Amino acid sequence: NFRGYAMFLRVISSFLFFFAEKFRHVNLIIEQGNTSSKVAVYNKRHMEASFVFKKFDVEVVSSIFKKYPLTKGIFSTVIDKDDELVEYLGSNLRNFVFLDETVSLPIKVQYKTPKTLGKDRLAAAVGANYLQPGKDLLVIDAGTAITYELIDASGSYLGGNISPGMTTRFRALNLFTEKLPLVVEQEYIPLVGTDTETAIQAGVVNGIVCEMDGYIEMLRLKYPNLLVFLTGGHSFYFERRLKNSIFADINLVLTGLNR
């Protein structure tokens, strides 16, 4: 009869929901940087949510666990490891990885000192290679430091360079001189400054743009089909200032970690 059929459908629906939730792979991706932590929740390859935290500890993570049925996770940090946090994640996730030099990767790492290689740098390289496999790639990450990572078409990470980031340069000029003020980035930057403040802004910002474009042009002499990714907290600031064609992806490191 109809009631029996309706009850049967409800039972089947409940079973399917339970089955789907049980085998649903919801990943917790944590990228802990020098000044903040980016956290994302992925359902397979789809990002369901993302957060940025200045303070990041067990209390913050536990609040995320209350909202999402997390089953897997990876934790990458460029600062000292928080043992309490790592233990909490390992105890509450079915499959947890703390990213270090012992973890197997989908790219070949030719860096001579893999233990000292920043995990954010490595994750960005993995993310770029995942999005554009079989291509020569340059990844520029504009944050506290600016990093340049080179991956060839065979999927080998060849190495990279590190230079001071925009905010770091502003602070250094103020810290290591007696009279130069501490300034911040502005939307409009002249080619040549007309006072001390704009001279610093123009020098720092235009200097970084020339640096980025210079690396791209030099590397394209050897890798003519080089593709360039730009990521990092300040990527939006340089995206439209570069004369070279790029792929801007603010979540590139998270994409790499989710691999």
Question: Predicted regions: what is each one?
Answer:
Residues F51, Y188-L227, H234, S245-I246:
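Adenine-nucleotide phosphate-binding core of ATP-dependent small-molecule kinases
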